[in-house]
Regions:
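A composition-biased, non-transmembrane "mature-region" signal
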Residues: 1-170
Length: 170
């Protein structure tokens, strides 16, 4: 792996893994959807972008809204993906927005801050005295890899390259 690959988050499949058809890769990515995970993978056509698929946190879905509201999540995160069958790769562009919870019935409001490219975010919250021995106890953890990790794993197991995009088009 070269320096540029490290900067972009590009990952290649293990040697000997046969590449699968684009339809199979897309179906495998969509197969990650489950009511038990805090993210959703959907068709990217509705975004008006060149993405084939978009993965994002389920911030506004009623079943997950309480969780995200309780943790006062301050960022929301999306991964735009385009499948490139002729190269056997999934090109991925991250997008992160700062958000605020507003109103009596809290709702999400996007702020003016956002990031595009390859985003790595880790947030943790602890409470003091929460552990059995009076030590600090982690009460909340958010890691952008909790969303990207499963996506990358499916792509690599399908024999395709995960190519991170820093700027420009997918």
């Amino acid at each position: 792996m070269g320096l540029f690959d490290k900067l972009t988050g590009t990952k290649r499949p293990a040697d000997g893994v046969a590449p699968r058809a684009a339809e199979e890769v897309q179906a495998a990515l969509l197969g990650l959807n489950s009511p038990d995970v805090p993210y959703v993978i959907r068709d990217g056509g509705a975004e008006g972008t060149e993405a084939d698929l978009v993965a994002e946190w389920r911030v506004l879905e009623p079943a997950w809204r309480t969780f995200f509201l309780r943790t006062q999540l301050s960022r929301t995160f999306k991964v735009h993906m385009r499948l490139v069958p002729e190269k056997g790769e999934v090109r991925a562009l991250d997008q992160q927005f700062e958000v605020d919870w507003v109103g009596d019935t809290p709702r999400l409001a996007l702020s003016s801050e956002s990031q595009r490219g390859q985003v790595k975010t880790v947030s943790k919250r602890w409470s003091l005295g929460g552990g059995e021995d009076g030590s600090r106890e982690e009460t909340f953890s958010f890691d952008s890899d909790d969303l990207k990790g499963p996506l990358q794993s499916v792509v690599l197991k399908s024999g395709w390259t995960w190519r991170g995009v820093i700027t420009g088009k997918l």
